[in-house]
Amino acid sequence: MTDLRAPVPPTGDSPADNLTLAPASVTDDRHRLHPAWIVAGVGFVALLGAAAFRSVPSVLIEPLHTEFGWSHATISTAISLNMLLYGLISPFAAALMDRFGIRKVVCSALVLIAAGSGLTVFMTQAWQLVATWGLLVGVGVGSMSMPFVATITGRWFVRSRGLVTGVLTAAGATGQLVFLPLVSMLATEHGWRLPSLLVAAVALSVVPLVWLFVRDYPSDVGVRAYGAPAGSDAGARVPIAGGANRALKVLASVARRPGFWLLAGGFAICGASTNGLVGTHFVTAAHDHGMPPTTAAGLLALVGIFDVAGTIASGWLSDRIDPRYLLLGYYSLRGLSLLILPSLLGPHTQPSMWVFIVFYGLDWIATVPPTVLLCRELFGADGPIAFGWVFAAHQVGAAIAATGAGLIRDLQGSYDLAWYLAGALCGIAAAMSMLVRRPKTAG
């Protein structure tokens, strides 16, 4: 077996090749910057840039409704397609990363996001909204969603895997929310087209960083995975073929396991109660109660800020506490908060609304680190692709909620029923989490 501790001569291909010559022993990890942290850092920026576009739809529902006369349900359909593809593309993207490499897949995805975002400024009909927001951007963000996180942490980290999963997850989730105030302000003062161009530029600007600094495996630069013990082959390149076929084969395999369906079902409810409902319709719902859109967008941005702390803390806790207990707590408390949300909405931000924002931020995507770890425990090397399918269920739930809530709003003139249904479903997700059976060898 090749000694992965030995340094590899620089190839000159990129700055990353010259930053990673230090051996990757446990001792060295304590004194030098392991290249895994460089990959994780660039991954954080890439996920943040990709998430920027996803902040646009919820803010622009009303401007598009006003300019084109499209119904809330019509606009929500385009957003739903985006969410659906965001999930359904994920497992295939994970397999393509195995086949062609992280760098090529992620750079291609960022270009797609930029193209879809930029083309929205030329649309005049509803089908064009579906083609740009829904199709192009949906494929792009789906190609570098949560399986991207699972692939980086699975290949590059042994130690601190849960923590890094939390940090990278926070980038994807928080990026969607922290851009909201800027997008809302630009849309209010300059129209909805400028924000679309801005987020296209953000996504495109990340491409050079990914190309220069991201590598597929630790062994590509002569090191082991961060925290791997001496003599371990963790981080070695594993020849994998199959691409899309492998994604389907993994699905056929994991679909025979009850644990997969329990995780997928719970995660579908997670998507419905976050991206699908709150992420898409909170600004419009608050506006229905007299709150200015910029204020509502600012509140969602605060959700994103607190999400950083909550998701990182969840990753840290996932390394120490049974992930099922964490999911039980997250889903239960989220359900309770959704049940009381209708009573908190109004023209002014009351202290009780601030409490909701802080709590919902801490809980927003805190479910991801324990779910990723459970997928790795249950499905081993197929964990990233299995999580891709679990995440697909997350986005199916989000798409259904986005469309369903829009229909409820059009039919009843209020989102109240949507909040109550989501709260009840979160209780079901909490129960499903505790039914997952961990392997006997799991911590």
Predicted regions, residues:
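Helix-loop-helix hairpin linking two adjacent transmembrane segments in secondary transporters
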Residues: 168-221
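Hydrophobic core of transmembrane alpha-helices in multi-pass small-molecule transporters
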Residues: 48, 116, 128-144, 268-269, ...
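A late C-terminal transmembrane helix in Major Facilitator Superfamily
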Residues: 167, 176, 365, 378-412, ...
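Extracytoplasmic
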Residues: 38-72, 90-93, 180, 276-283
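Helix-to-loop junctions at the C-terminal end of transmembrane segments
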Residues: 89-102, 311-323, 409-410
